[in-house]
């Protein structure tokens, strides 16, 4: 049986730390002038993948 291949796009977007999968936040790359500093700071805060999607992400990362 051949080796499982890691999804390269997923490997760049997600990092596995202990039991949680870290992810980036959307809506923070451009058109930032109309967004308040508080909103931009909240977008910079670390986020985690929801537990209902965790199995799908782990299978893309070949860790299921």
Curated annotation (Swiss-Prot):
SUPFAM superfamilies: L35p-like. Keywords: Ribonucleoprotein, Ribosomal protein. GO terms for cellular component: cytosolic large ribosomal subunit. Residues 38-64 are annotated as: Disordered. Residues 38-53 have a biased composition (Basic residues). It holds the Pfam family Ribosomal_L35p. GO terms for molecular function: structural constituent of ribosome. The keyword Transcription regulation does not apply. One of its GO terms (biological process) is translation. Belongs to the bacterial ribosomal protein bL35 family. PANTHER family: 54S RIBOSOMAL PROTEIN BL35M, LARGE RIBOSOMAL SUBUNIT PROTEIN BL35M. This is Large ribosomal subunit protein bL35. It comes from Helicobacter pylori (strain G27).
């Amino acid at each position: 049986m051949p080796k499982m291949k890691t999804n390269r796009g997923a490997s760049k977007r997600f990092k596995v730390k202990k039991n949680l999968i870290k992810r980036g936040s959307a809506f923070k790359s451009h058109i930032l002038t109309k967004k308040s500093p508080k909103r931009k700071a909240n977008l910079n805060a670390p986020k985690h993948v929801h537990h209902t999607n965790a199995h799908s992400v782990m299978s893309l990362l070949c860790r299921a």
